[in-house]
């Protein structure tokens, strides 16, 4: 038996296939693909910050003007970006994502499912730097050339791959007024990024034409070549378990456990961390003593406690040193320039998982034939071993560490009314949130 779905649009494609091989075994796959040509848009931030008293354009010289002296060192006339830098970027992005799975039901109450997912993207960008002249009444000749007065081109190619595999064993059973679902699993996640960029400016008297067909670094002066690159890999491995139980459909309980390992801390000995959660709910409106309340359709009381982890930092290898180009020096006879390197940040061999402990209690209710919905929650969250970067001071490089603890607590209340008048439906809602933050250490 096959179940299929396919769609195509301008620059994208979607396809899904499911096959029932036997009565208790099925396989399938899903695929998404897209080709995107991002528009060469310009930021509006400069326009918002520009002093409104400045003249935009000088009619006599036929040039856009610079901003007043107190601003021109920080930014350009926004019309320079809109008009003179328009259509100077060509980008082409591709993305393909999908998954394949197999699902096997056995021994009446068991199911084993394997899912393999992948997401791949490739982004290419070419940029052109034109020669831009502006009117500036404060300079000799009243005409100023922005930048170094040379045309230039740059290219950048970035690829990113994300791969995830999930292996899940589920037990599900209902007996009498009891219902139980238990899940055990093992998951892996891998993320890799590679970026390579290069740039050149024109040779003496050889202006690079403003033609996208020419925007390749090979057209520039080799003596002005610069380049940059980035590459990193990250991975996590997780073992997990979860239990969902309810009695009579009104007494609810859940509990979970997971053990996560992160490559971010693989050189510190702290890569593994355990996390837990428990929760309970009482569907109070299903009790006999609540049946006669006609204006109340549903009332549930709930509470939960749990821990979560965070491994995310801007630095892919925070426990290892990273060198970057710094100043150069001249040595030897004949003289030669030797590049210098410095630490990009101070590595920390003692880094560990950031851990968040949170609990909340609350209630949900529906009134007046489910037209009015209410939800209220009081929560408290404490973050320990906070992962953060310490800025460098007086020329020193930044550092990374588990720098403290923060407490957040507050109340969240939401009301929503949904109804229909004739053929017209409407929805009115509102919410109230309070939050109090406190630095504990």
Regions found by a protein language model. Name each.
Residues 16-35, 39-45, 72-129, 140-441:
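Extracellular/periplasmic, surface-exposed regions of secreted and cell-surface proteins
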Residues 46-51:
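Sec-exported N-terminal periplasmic low-complexity segments
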Residues 55-75, 133-146:
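A subset of solvent-exposed loop/turn segments in beta-rich extracellular surface proteins, enriched
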Residues 6, 53, 69, 210-213:
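Generic low-complexity segments that are intrinsically disordered, proline-rich and/or Lys/Arg-biased
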Residues 1-14:
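Single conserved hydrophobic/aromatic residue that forms the stacking wall/gate
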């Amino acid at each position: 038996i096959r179940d299929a779905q396919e769609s195509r649009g301008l620059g994208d494609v979607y396809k899904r296939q499911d096959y029932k091989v036997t009565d208790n075994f099925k396989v399938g796959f899903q695929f998404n693909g897209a080709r995107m040509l991002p528009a060469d848009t310009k930021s509006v931030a400069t326009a918002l910050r520009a002093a409104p008293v400045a003249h935009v354009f000088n009619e006599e010289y036929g040039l856009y003007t610079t901003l007043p002296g107190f601003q021109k060192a920080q930014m350009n006339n926004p019309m320079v970006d809109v008009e003179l830098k328009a259509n100077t970027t060509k980008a082409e992005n591709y993305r393909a994502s999908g998954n394949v799975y197999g699902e096997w039901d056995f021994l009446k109450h068991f199911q084993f499912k394997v899912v393999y997912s992948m997401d791949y993207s490739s982004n290419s960008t070419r940029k052109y730097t034109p020669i831009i002249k502006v009117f500036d009444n404060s300079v000799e000749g009243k005409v100023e050339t922005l930048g170094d007065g040379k045309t230039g081109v740059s290219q950048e190619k970035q690829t990113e791959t994300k791969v995830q595999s999930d292996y899940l064993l589920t037990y599900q059973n209902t007996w009498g007024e009891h219902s139980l679902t238990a899940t055990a699993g093992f998951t892996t996640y891998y993320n890799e990024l590679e970026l390579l960029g290069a740039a050149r400016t024109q040779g003496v008297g050889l202006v690079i034409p403003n033609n996208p067909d020419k925007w390749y670094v090979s057209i520039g002066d080799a003596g002005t070549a610069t380049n940059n690159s980035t590459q990193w890999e990250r991975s996590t491995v997780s073992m997990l378990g979860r239990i969902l139980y309810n009695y009579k459909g009104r007494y609810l309980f859940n509990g979970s456990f997971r053990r996560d390992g992160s490559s971010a801390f693989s050189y510190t000995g702290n890569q593994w961390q355990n996390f837990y959660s428990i929760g309970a709910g009482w569907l109070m409106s299903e009790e006999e003593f609540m049946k006669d309340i006609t204006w109340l359709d549903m009332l549930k009381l709930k509470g939960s406690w749990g821990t979560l982890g965070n491994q995310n930092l801007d630095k892919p290898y925070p426990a290892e040193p990273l060198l970057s180009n710094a100043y150069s020096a001249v040595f030897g006879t004949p003289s030669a320039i030797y590049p210098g390197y410095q630490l990009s940040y101070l590595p920390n061999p003692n880094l560990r998982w950031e851990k968040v402990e949170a609990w909340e209690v609350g209630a949900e209710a529906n009134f007046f034939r489910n037209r009015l919905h209410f939800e209220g929650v009081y929560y408290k969250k404490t973050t320990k071993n906070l992962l953060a970067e310490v800025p460098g001071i007086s020329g020193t490089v930044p550092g990374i560490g588990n720098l403290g603890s923060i407490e957040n607590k507050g109340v969240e209340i939401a009301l929503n009314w949904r109804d229909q008048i004739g053929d017209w439906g409407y929805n009115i809602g509102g919410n109230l949130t309070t939050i109090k933050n406190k630095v504990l250490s």
